[in-house]
Every structure is written in C-alpha cells, then in structure tokens.
C-alpha cells in the first residue's frame, strides 16, 4: 500500500474534528488511496471494509517511513492535518528532514489565531477554511469548503411522531442537545430553557447527550441539582456518552435538536439533527446562521440567552410544525451540506496542491 494522502486523527477523545474525519473517510476512499494515522474511527473501519485496496491503517512511524520517498508518479505525498501538533510534525518532516511531502490543513476557528498557530498555518501548502468567516482570519486560505454529513448515516425515522416510544422515557416527544457537558457548550442555557418550558408541555422530555469529563463533574452536578429542585429529574435526562455508531438513533428519537453553545468554530449538530428530520434551534455562533434557514428549518437566537432560546423552542413545541420544518431541514442538508460535496471540495484542494 502506497497512499497518496495520509490523514491524521492524533487525538484520543472523539471530538467535532474526529466527527468530520469519521464522515469523510468512507467517501474519500472511493477515489483516493488513503493512509490513516491515529485514533480509530467507525468511518475508518467502514472505509477499510468497503475499499481495502485504497485504504490502510498506518502507525505514525509507518507513515513517516513511507513519506521519505515520492509517490511512484513522482508527485509528493499529501498529509492532511487538522491540529497544531500534527502541523508541527509535518513541518518538521518537510522542512527539517526534507521529506518530499505537501501539507494541507483545515481551519474552522472564527477568531484570530495566536502567533504560533498563525506561523504554523502560514507554512501549509494548502489551507481549507470551513466558512468565509474562518477564511477571513487565514490569509492563505486555498478554498472554503463547508463541512457536510452522510445522508445514509443520518436519516429520518419512518414515523417521527411515534419514534420517541422506543426510548422508554416519559412523554410523547423529545428535545435533545448533543455535545460535551461543559459551560462553553451552553448546557446550562439549555437546562434553563427546559426548566421554563417543560412544566407547560407535559408531552415533552429533554435529553442531554455527551461526555462530562471529571473537570466538569461539578458543573453537571449543579445542573442536576437545579433540575431536581424544579421537580424535573425524570424529564431532563443526562444520557452520558453516546457511541458514534448510535448517535444518529438519538437524533431520530427527538423532535427538536437544540445547539446553544457560547462559541463554536463550525458545529455539526444542527446538520445532523436536520438530516434526521428534526426542527432546529441554534445560537448565533459557528456556521449555524448559514446552516439554518430561519423560520423554515428552525431558528437562530442570540448566544447566551436562555430566555430567547426558550421563546424559539416554544414555537416548535407544536409537533405538526416541527415535523414540517424537519422535512425542510432534511432537504436543505441534501442540497447543500452533504459529505460528498465536502469530499469533492477537499479533492479539489489536493489537486491544486499537486499542481503547484
């Protein structure tokens, strides 16, 4: 195996970056020879199963060893990296050890990087920004390529009205938020809105799906105490970590997906919810204003406002309206935000880097 592109995922915990790599690998392996380095992902396993002739797992040392030489056609091998340590490694290989490689980096941050990441990014051969705003902070952006998701993996259930029954939780309908349990993800804002709304809407139960690290155990405990004081412990439920293979089931289960972080570089949760037929309420950060078609697929509200979040969610607690918006959301994702479209944009960047 002599991969054209080496894709890295050198972080142990599953994150938003991991999620984008996970979605892309099976699609990219259809047309590219890929070597995958780092923490395993379901998408990597699928890519190897479906395209064993074009996909291989590599250790870091194996990837370094094969990168000493050019590809058989004389082209340099591309390393596609997404994190600072990965940029540092590849710059060392290319500029110090003089390996014949090219480096592509994906940037999603919607703020000016500090001096060291700026320097690292300036050394890239190609830079992909996920939004025009992210590109405005990276002068050497090669192309803007929005993230996309798999319509096969994220799909609506046969009956959104009755699917909640399979959860065994109270009520007829679900409202879900997906992400790590910590302040920057706005989980306290979500809980505030649910405490305000759920007593008025007995048919609804809220779920919070995501990892809580020991650092934020106290934060979750405070939220649980607030929920208990409101008498809602059975109707605002912490699910904990949801396996990447089954997270789509929970998007199917809920009628409304809420994404209310205080800051997000891009944010996949509204896309994943919309693809599963959910109406969406999102805070005004990340790419959410681009993703959500206001009033048609959901609503975007000011960041850090539980009151505004509750107002928007209240409008969607009409199941008929929420289902209609969810259908439009699925159509919007299919038209603009598929992983196939993202993979095509990335392939175009690879091609331009090889031509330089």
Over which residues does each language-model region extend?
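Donor nucleotide-sugar binding/catalytic pocket of nucleotide-sugar-dependent glycosyltransferases
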Residues: 121-160, 169-170
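Conserved donor-binding/catalytic core segment of Leloir-type glycosyltransferases
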Residues: 166-185, 191-195, 207
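Nucleotide-activated donor-binding/catalytic signature segment of Leloir-type glycosyltransferases, i.e.
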Residues: 220-241
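Short alpha-helical donor nucleotide-sugar binding micro-motif in glycosyltransferases
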Residues: 241-242, 249-254
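Aromatic "clamp/platform" in nucleotide-sugar-dependent glycosyltransferases that forms part
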Residues: 262
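Short hydrophobic beta-strand element within catalytic cores of glycosyltransferases
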Residues: 279-283
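Conserved acidic donor-binding segment of nucleotide-sugar-dependent glycosyltransferases
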Residues: 294-295, 299-306, 314-320
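A short, well-ordered alpha-helix in the C-terminal region of glycosyltransferases
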Residues: 321-336, 342-345
């Amino acid at each position: 195996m002599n991969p054209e592109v080496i894709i890295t995922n050198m972080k142990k915990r599953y994150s938003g970056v991991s999620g984008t790599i996970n979605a892309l690998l099976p699609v990219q392996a259809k047309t590219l020879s890929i070597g995958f380095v780092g923490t395993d992902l379901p998408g990597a396993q699928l890519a190897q199963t479906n395209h064993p002739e074009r996909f291989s797992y590599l250790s870091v040392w194996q990837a370094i060893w094969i990168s000493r030489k050019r590809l058989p056609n004389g082209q340099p091998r591309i390393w596609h990296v997404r994190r600072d340590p990965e940029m540092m490694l590849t710059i060392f290989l290319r500029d110090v050890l003089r390996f014949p490689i090219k480096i592509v980096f994906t940037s999603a941050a919607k703020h000016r990087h500090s001096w060291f990441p700026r320097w690292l990014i300036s050394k890239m051969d190609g830079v992909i920004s996920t939004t025009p705003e992210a590109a405005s902070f990276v002068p050497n952006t090669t192309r803007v390529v929005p993230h996309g998701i798999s319509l096969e993996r994220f799909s609506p259930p046969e009956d959104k009205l009755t699917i909640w029954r399979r959860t065994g939780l109270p009520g007829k309908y679900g409202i879900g938020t997906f992400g790590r349990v910590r302040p920057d993800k706005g989980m306290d804002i979500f809980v505030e809105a649910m405490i305000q709304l759920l007593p008025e809407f007995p048919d609804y139960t809220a779920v919070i799906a995501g990892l809580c690290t020991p650092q934020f155990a106290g934060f979750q405990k405070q939220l649980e105490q607030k929920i208990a004081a409101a008498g809602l412990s059975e109707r605002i439920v912490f699910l904990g970590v949801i396996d990447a293979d089954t997270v789509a089931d929970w998007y199917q289960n809920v009628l409304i997906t809420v994404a209310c972080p205080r800051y997000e570089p891009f944010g996949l949760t509204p896309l994943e919810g919309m693809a599963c037929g959910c109406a969406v309420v999102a805070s005004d950060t990340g790419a959410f204003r681009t993703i959500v078609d206001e009033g048609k697929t959901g609503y975007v509200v000011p960041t850090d406002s539980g009151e505004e979040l509750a107002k928007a969610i209240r409008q969607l607690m009409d199941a008929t309206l929420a289902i209609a918006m969810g259908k439009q959301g699925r159509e919007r994702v299919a038209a603009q935000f598929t992983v196939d479209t993202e993979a095509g944009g990335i392939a175009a960047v690879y091609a331009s880097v090889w031509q330089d």
